[in-house]
């Protein structure tokens, strides 16, 4: 694929909402956008990204500073941040957003193979909606984001490619940290607009310091990308809030006809030091944490 810069996520409409699609800039500049579209996995991944942008733009010290900041203050900070880091949000280019050009040697998968509602390989097509369709750039961006944290376990990832020297990978890729084994239940505070939602879910420095993130808020990966699965940057992501919001559980590279995908950073889960996303529901009061699993047959 041509590695010229194109499709900047700050400017291009790619985020599904009721009225169509909007850009990252519009999330924080428009007060009339009330909610996200897409599947549950897409909504979770998008809300985590919006929180990551918000935390990077402005993490208040405490509740009092959070209240003074308000929706408008956070929106202004996020717009300034997106302008400052505009070059980091190109979906295609020499340094594509949340991607690893070094995995180009991994096998090329069809995009449909990473979509849970699409039948590929020897899976039977029962409904027309399950047939694989070409994806546009907006859909590819969304698929990439979902696979950072909500990827499924299995053998579709290429185990033969590792970016960290000497690292050996198992036959099956681990499920993303936002899912774990059975599908974690996520809960978010929802505002009257998407930018108010971002403010309501914004954590303070005091809250982060009291929780389970050894390295605090941390640095978002689009500012400093790891060069391997277990280097210093990757290790820091396993210990920070940013690493839970954008965990890079898969190392991917988008191509015109498909996607290169290998297992990325293996994050500890709730049984390994109690590490969880800030949005998951569970009981950590006992010695062994107990998580609530998503059940479509039950209403949370």
Regions found by a protein language model. Name each.
Residues 1-127, 131-238, 246-248, 255, ...:
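Conserved small-residue
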